């Protein structure tokens, strides 16, 4: 009988991650079947999506509260199906607020519940690890310091590395990126990444534009690249430019192309998030910044454990790149921090060395290692050839 795996992936990033995992499992167990909540990339791998993963996309606490009844209903319906169909295993990909409850119920029903992508318990709300220990059969972690946290709590855990480290080259081709973007090799370039969400562009757009204007006064030859992934964020940034007379800035908006923009840049101004990790894997000097509502910032600060918010600093356990958050996020301070990377090649070279070491530590062939951690829970695992993985 073919092994069956139920899965839930939240949002587009989870859809991509899960699709790679499905492919890696199928390479070892060709007749494996998958069903649950997923997106188009999972469906392209033969996944039976009973609900689309876009339904799980919530933006902030207010949206989550408004949609609680809808999401709770979907979760209960899926749980009923899993209990009835009894797959060999369940894999929750990210979306911890949705998946951990589900995983606890599924584990209690005697079905292995695996969670792929550890919640950021090392950054805030560390008490969640008790709930995780009750809810999951195994945790698959992306960062090398995470397994120790789970081992101390008695949670079976596997370190699988980060998929971006597999995708990004160890030595980015800056010249090729500049050629694709039609930028002269000798020109100074700063990439501005104010975030992927509309709320982030609203909060940070004008700040980034004012910072660019200040830096352009000091370095008239600089070119600013602003990659924006959606029409909505592009319109918001264009409106901010118009309000701040940004038409005179040497600035080019790109539709997507964030990786090319960062690869081509001498320095990056980036909102805290996954983009900061991408910049580190591309070995780019950066300044990390963020602004949010005052009450939200106070709440986050009270619940946080680490002195840093950016993944590069957290992963290196050191303040390698400047972080200017909330009241410290001002155009003069941001311009000063960016300028350092434009005029100090020795500091940039030292940073490249540290980021290269980080890249090596995260490059683990994530999909294969994750698949190897899942295979022992499948009914046909005895007949497949798992890739060796350290737990």
Swiss-Prot record:
Enzyme Commission numbers on file: 2.4.1.182
Enzyme class: transferase
Upper classification of the organism: Bacteria, Pseudomonadati, Pseudomonadota, Betaproteobacteria, Rhodocyclales
Ranges in a coiled coil: none
GO molecular function: lipid-A-disaccharide synthase activity; phospholipid binding
NCBIfam families noted in UniProt: lpxB (TIGR00215)
Domain of life: Bacteria
GO CC list: membrane
Entry's Gene Ontology BP terms: lipid A biosynthetic process
Pfam annotation, one family: LpxB
Pathway in which the depicted protein is active: Bacterial outer membrane biogenesis; LPS lipid A biosynthesis
Protein family according to the UniProt entry: Belongs to the LpxB family.
Keyword terms, alphabetized: Glycosyltransferase, Lipid A biosynthesis, Lipid biosynthesis, Lipid metabolism, Transferase
Protein's recorded name: Lipid-A-disaccharide synthase
Reactions that this protein is recorded to catalyse: a lipid X + a UDP-2-N,3-O-bis[(3R)-3-hydroxyacyl]-alpha-D-glucosamine = a lipid A disaccharide + UDP + H(+)
Cited function: Condensation of UDP-2,3-diacylglucosamine and 2,3-diacylglucosamine-1-phosphate to form lipid A disaccharide, a precursor of lipid A, a phosphorylated glycolipid that anchors the lipopolysaccharide to the outer membrane of the cell.
């Amino acid at each position: 009988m073919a092994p069956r795996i139920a899965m839930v992936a939240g949002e587009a990033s989870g859809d991509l991650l899960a699709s790679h995992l499905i492919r890696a499992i199928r390479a070892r167990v060709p007749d494996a079947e998958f069903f649950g909540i997923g997106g188009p990339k999972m469906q392209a791998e033969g996944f039976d999506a009973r609900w689309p993963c876009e339904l799980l996309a919530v933006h902030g606490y207010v949206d989550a509260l408004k949609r609680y009844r809808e999401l709770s209903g979907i979760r209960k319906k899926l749980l009923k199906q899993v209990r009835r169909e009894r797959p060999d295993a369940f894999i929750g990909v990210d979306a911890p607020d949705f998946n951990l409850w589900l995983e606890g119920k599924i584990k209690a029903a005697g079905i292995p519940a695996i969670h792929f992508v550890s919640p950021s318990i090392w950054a805030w709300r560390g008490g969640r690890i008790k709930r995780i220990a009750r809810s999951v059969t195994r945790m698959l972690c992306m960062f090398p310091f995470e397994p120790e946290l789970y081992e101390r709590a008695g949670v079976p855990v596997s370190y699988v590395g980060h998929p971006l480290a597999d995708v990004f080259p160890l030595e980015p081709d800056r010249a090729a990126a500049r050629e694709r973007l039609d930028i002269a090799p000798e020109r100074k370039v700063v990439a501005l990444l104010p975030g992927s969400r509309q709320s982030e562009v609203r909060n940070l757009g004008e700040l980034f534009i004012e910072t660019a204007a200040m830096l352009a006064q000091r370095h008239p030859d600089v070119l600013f690249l602003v990659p924006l992934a959606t029409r909505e964020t592009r319109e918001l940034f264009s409106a901010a430019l118009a309000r701040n007379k940004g038409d005179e800035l040497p600035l080019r908006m790109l539709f997507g192309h964030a990786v090319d923009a960062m690869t081509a840049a001498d320095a990056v101004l980036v909102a805290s998030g996954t983009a900061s990790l991408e910049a580190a894997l591309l070995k780019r000097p950066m300044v990390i910044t963020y602004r949010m509502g005052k009450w939200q910032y106070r709440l986050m600060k009270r619940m946080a454990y680490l002195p840093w918010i950016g993944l590069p600093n957290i992963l290196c356990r050191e303040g390698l790149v400047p972080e200017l958050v909330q009241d410290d996020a001002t155009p003069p301070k941001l311009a000063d921090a960016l300028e350092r990377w434009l005029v100090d090649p020795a500091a940039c070279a030292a940073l490249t060395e540290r980021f290269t070491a980080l890249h090596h530590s995260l490059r683990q062939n994530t999909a294969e290692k994750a698949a190897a951690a899942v295979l022992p829970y499948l009914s046909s695992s005895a007949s497949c050839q798992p890739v060796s993985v350290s737990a």
